């Protein structure tokens, strides 16, 4: 029978390792502490932001365009372009290795006929014949000689509109630009001792690394960015490049101030934020063509990374705010594809990422000021999600993208199953990106944003790198931890998930077929078959079963078994000590605890109701211990639970133990049990109702509570799946034989299935009412 799962959990739920007990005790310990915050804090909330001051950055970023610098003579670094920006005609730059290469560059204005001009090159007056036939472009000309007393020859002219020129030392050569803008390219001159060549620039210049040569070529051909051409850009001396910058460390703990008991610490940290989105996709009832909701939900993610040689364990919670609700209605027919609501995040939305790690910075994050952060941006793209229809091509929601840009940081608290974590909440504003999203095989296309259908696009996580800085008030002794005001046993996040799961479970009650339920209730469900719908591997199922058993150990059902075991132990001791029949009768009634009740309470209508209600609450255990061939309430309860577990879309390893335990306690709260003696049936329910009647005629007879208590002790207890009122109604309207009546009284599953297959409305309504009682 399906109720085997409950008996198996009861049998095995006590095999919990001692280490698990110790860990659980430590995690559920609460502590209330009153703190005098001292002179640094006025409230127990985060103080006002006094300004972040300097936020050190541990990442050295080499600028693309470094400058401008004033005209000077120096030895440029190898593999760096000098981007020269002359304003007038004349000598632009000159350089030599004083051995076999003297190289200079001159600038000639537009529309110059062939003429001889005098230039000062390397301190000497030199006559050079020059010309520029272009009406609009300036002309750069290289003048080169190989001996100190030799003559200059002209090489590699560059016709330029932006009036920019470049020169670089690299790989035993001196590189320059030639050709005509906007299609200029590089050329070179071979030289020895190239790294010792000193350059003299006669105009402002910039320095660009070789890695950004494409950018340098873009400037040569098209000009500098507009901001570089304003009067607010002032050239500085090249010696400013020699200033030594202190490289910040990935981890910095700086003492800002201290008193006798407290100190202010500034924590600077490089961090790696990994996060992912979670979603909920709920299918509506009916023929399988309609979905009620596709929505975002908060997602927790735990990971490790290395920071300055130290392994850091981090925890993030990602949530969204300001979502946009869309819908699609393919028509009014039952087979038309419909999504009642699907959520999309766009430029009016925000993403919140709560970050915590196990470093010292988060250990005392209670009184904090001067909080600042600098984070990179990240793009999130949507994947393909197919809506599986029973027949026809599947609609596919595909595409969509947004970029996340840092928009601030505040203090926050993350809630996990056992603890609350003081953390940082990073707020991100969104901008929509290409491509747009669409639903293939529908009219929906060209919409921008990130839909909730598959926001992670098959990626395990998204990653953002950055750095934060804060000043925290902490105890002077590092061994002490700042007390927090609230308990650490906070389960809000788990309770929220359980609330959503309870709603889903309750809605699934309407989708259970009764004939299949009866068949499932007859199967011997064990832990592996019960949880096989969630995990496919045996190891995963075993781990999940262990978690369920740990939680089940604390259930009211397990506590009842423990109490019953103690009662039976006391009963056995009393039997061994006393030979009186009354003593045996009293102690043997440990199943019901009614011996004293029956003798102490006056037998009135109200007292009988109280007694039968008390007895009925204990009969579940008696029935489980004396299993019969008939079906019982726990068989139906377990079958409904199995069906809902297989259909659920929100169930996970964290919520499963809670759901299984709640189901064992709350499914079918109104139960009735009966005992049969010859032609008499005594039946009592947990709500205090009781009946005694004849099997042949269903005629009611006086109810004897003492007789009921004695029969409960000596006879099998049967679940009243079809209770007395239903049986009487069935007999009055349809008429049933004595054998059928006995089979229904014994809850024979074969007869129940026959009545259901015959679509008997009275039996169906009774079973449906039991299914609807399977609620959380």
Swiss-Prot record:
Annotated site residue numbers, Binding to sialic acid: 101, 190
Motif (DGE motif): 308-310
One Gene Ontology biological process: virion attachment to host cell
Spike head: region residues: 65-224
Pfam families registered for this protein in UniProt: Rota_VP4_MID, VP4_haemagglut, VP4_helical
Keywords: Capsid protein, Coiled coil, Disulfide bond, Hemagglutinin, Host cell membrane, Host cytoplasm, Host cytoskeleton, Host endoplasmic reticulum, Host membrane, Host-virus interaction, Membrane, Outer capsid protein, Viral attachment to host cell, Viral penetration into host cytoplasm, Viral penetration via permeabilization of host membrane, Virion, Virus entry into host cell
Annotated spans, Hydrophobic: 389-409
Positions in coiled-coil regions: 484-518
Disulfide bonds: 203-216, 318-380
Motif (YGL motif): 448-450
Annotated site residues (Cleavage) in this chain: 231-232, 241-242, 247-248
GO cellular component: host cell endoplasmic reticulum-Golgi intermediate compartment; host cell plasma membrane; host cell rough endoplasmic reticulum; host cytoskeleton; membrane; viral outer capsid
Highest taxon of the lineage: Viruses
Motif (KID motif): 644-646
Stretches for region Spike body and stalk (antigen domain): 248-479
InterPro entries reported in the protein's UniProt record: ConA-like_dom_sf (IPR013320), Rota_A_VP4 (IPR042546), Rota_VP4_MID (IPR035330), Rota_VP4_MID_sf (IPR038017), VP4_concanavalin-like (IPR000416), VP4_helical (IPR035329)
Chain positions covered by the region annotation Spike foot: 510-776
Any further remark recorded for this protein: In group A rotaviruses, VP4 defines the P serotype. Some rotavirus strains are neuraminidase-sensitive and require sialic acid to attach to the cell surface. Some rotavirus strains are integrin-dependent. Some rotavirus strains depend on ganglioside for their entry into the host cell. Hsp70 also seems to be involved in the entry of some strains.
Family that this chain belongs to: Belongs to the rotavirus VP4 family.
Name this polypeptide is given: Outer capsid protein VP4
């Amino acid at each position: 029978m399906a109720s085997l799962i409950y008996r198996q959990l009861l049998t095995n739920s006590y095999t919990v390792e001692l280490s698990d007990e110790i860990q659980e005790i430590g995690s559920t310990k609460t502590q209330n502490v009153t703190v005098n915050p001292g002179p640094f804090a006025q409230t127990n909330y985060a103080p006002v932001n006094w300004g972040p001051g300097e936020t050190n950055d541990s990442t050295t970023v080499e600028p693309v365009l470094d400058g401008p610098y004033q005209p000077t003579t120096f030895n440029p670094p190898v593999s760096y372009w000098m981007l020269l920006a002359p304003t007038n005609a004349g000598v632009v730059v000159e350089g030599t290795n004083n051995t076999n290469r003297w190289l200079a560059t001159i600038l000639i204005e537009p529309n110059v006929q062939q003429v001889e001009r005098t230039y000062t090159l390397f301190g000497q007056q030199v006559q050079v014949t020059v010309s520029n036939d272009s009406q609009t472009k300036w002309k750069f000309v290289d003048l080169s000689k190989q001996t100190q007393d030799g003559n200059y020859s002209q090489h590699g002219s560059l016709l330029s509109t932006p009036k920019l020129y470049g020169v670089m030392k690299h790989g035993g050569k001196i590189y320059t630009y030639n050709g005509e803008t906007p299609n200029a390219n590089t050329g070179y001159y071979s030289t020895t001792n190239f790294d010792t060549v000193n350059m003299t620039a006669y105009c402002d210049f910039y320095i660009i690394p070789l890695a950004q040569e494409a950018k340098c070529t873009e400037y040569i051909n098209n000009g500098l960015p507009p901001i570089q051409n304003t009067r607010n850009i002032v050239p500085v001396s090249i010696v400013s490049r020699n200033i030594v910058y202190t490289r910040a460390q990935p981890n910095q703990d700086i003492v800002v101030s201290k008193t006798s008991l407290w100190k202010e610490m500034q924590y600077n940290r490089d961090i790696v934020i990994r996060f992912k989105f979670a979603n909920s996709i709920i299918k509506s009832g009916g023929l399988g063509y309609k979905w009620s909701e596709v929505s975002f939900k908060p997602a927790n993610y735990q990971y490790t990374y290395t920071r300055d040689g130290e392994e850091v364990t981090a925890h993030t919670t990602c949530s969204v705010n300001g979502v946009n609700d869309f819908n699609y209605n393919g028509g009014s027919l039952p087979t038309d594809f419909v999504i009642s609501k699907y959520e999309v995040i766009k430029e009016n939305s925000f993403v919140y990422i709560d970050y915590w790690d196990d470093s010292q910075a988060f250990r005392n994050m209670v009184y904090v000021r001067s909080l600042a952060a600098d984070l990179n941006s990240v793009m999130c793209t949507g994947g393909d999600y197919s809506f599986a229809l029973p027949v026809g091509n599947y609609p596919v929601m595909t595409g969509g993208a947004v970029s996340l840009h840092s928009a601030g940081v505040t203090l926050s608290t993350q809630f996990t199953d056992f603890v609350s974590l003081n953390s940082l909440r990073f707020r991100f504003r969104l901008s929509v990106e290409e491509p747009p999203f669409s639903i293939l095989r529908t009219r929906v296309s060209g919409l921008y944003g990130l839909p909730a259908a598959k926001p992670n696009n098959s990626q395990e996580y998204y990653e953002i790198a950055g750095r934060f800085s804060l000043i925290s008030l902490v105890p002077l002794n590092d061994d002490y931890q700042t007390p927090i005001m609230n308990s650490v046993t906070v389960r809000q996040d788990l309770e929220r998930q359980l609330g959503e799961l309870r709603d889903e479970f309750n809605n699934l009650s309407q989708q259970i077929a009764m004939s299949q339920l009866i068949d499932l209730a007859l199967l011997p469900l064990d832990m592996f078959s019960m949880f096989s719908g969630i995990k496919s591997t045996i190891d995963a199922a075993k781990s999940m079963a262990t978690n369920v058993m740990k939680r089940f150990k604390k259930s009211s059902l397990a506590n009842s078994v423990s109490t019953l075991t103690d009662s039976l132990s006391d009963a056995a001791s009393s039997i061994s000590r006393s030979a009186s029949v009354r003593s045996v009768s009293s102690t043997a009634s440990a199943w019901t605890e009614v011996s004293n009740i029956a003798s102490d309470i006056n037998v009135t209508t109200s007292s009988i109701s109280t007694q039968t209600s008390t007895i009925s609450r204990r009969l579940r255990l008696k029935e489980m211990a004396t299993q019969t061939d008939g079906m019982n309430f726990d068989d139906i309860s377990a079958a409904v639970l199995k069906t809902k577990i297989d259909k659920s879309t929100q169930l996970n390893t964290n919520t499963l133990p809670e759901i299984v335990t709640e189901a064992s306690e709350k499914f079918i709260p109104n139960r009735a049990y009966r005992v049969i003696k010859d032609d008499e049936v005594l039946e009592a329910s947990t709500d205090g109702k009781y009946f005694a009647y004849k099997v042949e005629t269903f005629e009611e007879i006086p109810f004897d509570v003492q007789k009921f208590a004695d029969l409960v002790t000596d006879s099998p207890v049967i679940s009243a799946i079809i209770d007395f009122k239903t049986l009487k109604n069935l007999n009055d309207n349809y008429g049933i034989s004595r054998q059928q009546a006995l089979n229904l009284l014994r809850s024979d599953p074969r007869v129940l299935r026959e009545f259901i297959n015959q679509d008997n409305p009275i039996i169906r309504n009774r079973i449906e009412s039991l299914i609807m009682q399977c609620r959380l």
